[in-house]
């Protein structure tokens, strides 16, 4: 199975402008993400960006970058454009979308994202981590996976929500926003219009579920730090300086 890892990066973050180039231990944040993606050992790693300075920084550190349009509404749209430019011969079968603001991500969980594709019925694969901190259960910024257990380490996703769900006894799962797509699934997904539940929850993945696509989540133990604020950036600097 030929795999391409794509890392979408844009400079226009509302809470932390310019974060792809934020310095962490002497290298831009986007380069740390690319290094960890390469360590996953799945295949080619390319940063997809709309900003020339990001592309130049990535290339200066020995990684590939491809320029994309500036008007994309989502990372999925950006990686779809990048895929078409990088693989016109359609040799790539699976695409892993690694967010560009995860500089501490464990390469092992990037590799784990492909495991659900052992089932040919799965269109999109993603990751989840069991929630252990009580405050995360009610935090709307922590997206939860509501799913049917397939094994001790896998769920079939039925819904994603910012609410505390499901109700009752049992574990809750924190969704890690990393996606692996079969090529046909990515092409179908980006052709869909935003869905009602997607708009309501502000969660793009609900578009796929509402269209009848299957998403399975591999349950892992490592939760990467998403860098969205100056405070997150300082935490990442502390983690990566050790």
Curated annotation (Swiss-Prot):
Q: Which domain of life is it from?
A: Bacteria
Keyword Cell cycle present in the record's keywords: the answer is no
| CDD domains according to UniProt | CMP-KDO-Synthetase
- Which pathway does this chain act in? Nucleotide-sugar biosynthesis; CMP-3-deoxy-D-manno-octulosonate biosynthesis; CMP-3-deoxy-D-manno-octulosonate from 3-deoxy-D-manno-octulosonate and CTP: step 1/1; Bacterial outer membrane biogenesis; lipopolysaccharide biosynthesis
What EC number(s) has UniProt assigned to this enzyme?
Answer: 2.7.7.38
Q: Which GO terms describe its molecular function?
A: 3-deoxy-manno-octulosonate cytidylyltransferase activity
* Single Gene Ontology BP annotation: lipopolysaccharide biosynthetic process
Q: Catalytic activity annotated for this protein?
A: 3-deoxy-alpha-D-manno-oct-2-ulosonate + CTP = CMP-3-deoxy-beta-D-manno-octulosonate + diphosphate
* Protein keywords: Cytoplasm, Lipopolysaccharide biosynthesis, Nucleotidyltransferase, Transferase
Q: Where in the cell is it found?
A: Cytoplasm
Q: Which GO terms describe its cellular component?
A: cytosol
Q: What InterPro entries is this protein classified in? A: Cytidylyl_trans (IPR003329), KdsB (IPR004528), Nucleotide-diphossugar_trans (IPR029044)
Function statement:
Activates KDO (a required 8-carbon sugar) for incorporation into bacterial lipopolysaccharide in Gram-negative bacteria.
The entry's family comment says: Belongs to the KdsB family.
PANTHER family in the record, alphabetically?
3-DEOXY-MANNO-OCTULOSONATE CYTIDYLYLTRANSFERASE, 3-DEOXY-MANNO-OCTULOSONATE CYTIDYLYLTRANSFERASE, MITOCHONDRIAL
Supply the name of the protein. Answer: 3-deoxy-manno-octulosonate cytidylyltransferase
Q: Which organism is it from?
A: Mesorhizobium japonicum (strain LMG 29417 / CECT 9101 / MAFF 303099) (Mesorhizobium loti (strain MAFF 303099))
Q: What is the lineage of its organism?
A: Bacteria, Pseudomonadati, Pseudomonadota, Alphaproteobacteria, Hyphomicrobiales
């Amino acid at each position: 199975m030929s795999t391409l890892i794509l890392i979408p990066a844009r400079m226009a973050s509302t809470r932390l402008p310019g974060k792809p180039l934020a310095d962490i231990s002497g290298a831009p944040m986007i380069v740390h993400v690319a290094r960890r993606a390469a360590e996953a050992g799945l295949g080619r790693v390319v940063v997809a960006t709309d900003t020339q300075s990001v592309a130049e920084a990535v290339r200066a550190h020995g990684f590939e970058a491809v320029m994309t349009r500036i008007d994309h509404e989502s990372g999925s749209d950006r990686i779809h454009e990048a895929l078409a430019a990088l693989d016109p011969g359609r040799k790539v079968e699976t695409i892993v979308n690694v967010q560009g603001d995860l500089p501490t991500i464990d390469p092992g969980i990037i590799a784990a994202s492909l495991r659900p594709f052992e089932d040919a019925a799965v269109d999109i694969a993603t990751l989840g981590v069991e929630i252990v901190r009580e405050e995360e259960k009610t935090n709307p910024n922590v997206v939860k996976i509501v799913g049917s257990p397939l094994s001790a380490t896998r769920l079939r996703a039925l819904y994603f929500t910012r609410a505390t769900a499901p109700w009752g006894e049992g574990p809750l799962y924190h969704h890690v926003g990393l996606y692996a797509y079969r090529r046909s699934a990515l092409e179908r997904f980006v052709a869909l219009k935003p869905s009602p539940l997607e708009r309501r929850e502000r969660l793009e993945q609900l578009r796929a579920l509402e269209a009848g696509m299957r998403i399975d989540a591999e349950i892992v133990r490592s939760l990467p730090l998403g860098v969205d604020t100056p405070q997150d950036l300082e935490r990442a600097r502390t983690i990566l300086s050790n």
